Amino acid sequence: SIRRQRQMCIRDRAELSEDKRLRFTNKSHNEIYVITYQDSPNVMKEIGRLREIAFRAAGGGTGKAMDIDEYDVMENPYKQLVVWNPEAEEILGGYRYLLGDEVQFDEHGKPVLATAHMFNFSEVFLKEYLPYTVELGRSFVTLEYQSTRAGSKGLFALDNLWDGLGALTVIKPNVKYFFGKMTMYPSYHRQGRDMILYFLNKHFGDKDKLITPMKPLEIETDKKMLENLFCYDSFKEDYKILNTEVRKLGYNIPPLVNAYMSLSPTMRMFGTAINYGFGDVEETGILIAVNEILEDKRVRHIESFVKQHPEAMKITSGAHPILTK
């Protein structure tokens, strides 16, 4: 009922205390908080409810009332980064993340990561990358804010989330990489999906095998046809073809795929695995180096935080490589 939701909001609000607020957003006057299941159980339940609704609407999800798993509730849990709309007192969206230097290892020496059931991590990655990496997952925008009817609040929900990630790189100066997944759904056109995956592999494929899918998803479309289609050396020219061809099929390139591609020219793509416990969605592993994020995005999401919080530079000893680049 509406009354119950309203009470939920009041309990949420009490848990979203000032000490958990990370920053204000660049756009839409929203607020970003970092919480855990342990310090904000009601907010966690609301995140789980909203996540499940958003993922299920797209063809994923757990099939339960709430999407909350062991990684959300374990002893050293994933942290939840949420965008809060203070006017409507609602959560607009979120990510969950775990800092690489806080990752635990099981008795077999495997990292306790939400992606460890889908991807193998090389020794090089575990030793040279993981301690400086943030693993991101469960990125969502609340269903009501996904439509154009939500106006500017909805339009900037993803932008707001990235403000949060930008702030993380400042307050955690050892963070050099973001590791995460681009999700595509089984309902997406197969040939369109194959074009996108071929294009990503051609321009961003990881040659070092830092991370590999345990059961790689195989492209169904004829490789020769894709080779002939994407015949340019430049990302820009091939991208024009991709955009045109996907539209011919009556689809768009998924917004997050587009957004990640435009973050950094040196993004690494690790292949695609199927997430069998989550509606069989197709997860493509990616790694982005923070100091290679394109300048306009860096200014927008990272430097704006420093302007809001000049004291944060003391934490980073005033010599953060991203900001002095």
Spans of features found by a protein language model:
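Short, flexible loop/turn elements at secondary-structure junctions
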Residues: T36-D39, N85-A88, R96-E102, R138-L143, ...
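Scaffold helices S1-S3 of the voltage-sensor/voltage-sensor-like domain
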Residues: E75-N76, V82-N85, E90-N120
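Intrinsically disordered, low-complexity, positively biased terminal segments
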Residues: I35, P41, R56, K223, ...
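Single conserved hydrophobic/aromatic residue that forms the stacking wall/gate
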Residues: S1-R6, I10
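Acyl-donor binding region in acyl/amide transferases
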Residues: T62, M66, E102-M267, G271
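Short, solvent-exposed loop/turn elements at beta->coil junctions and helix N-caps
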Residues: M66-D72, T272-G277
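A short helix-loop-beta-strand connector motif used in the catalytic cores of GNAT acetyltransferases and
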Residues: D72-V82, F105, M267-R268, F278-T284
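Short amphipathic alpha-helix that is part of the acyltransferase structural core
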Residues: F24-D69, Q80-A88, L92-L99
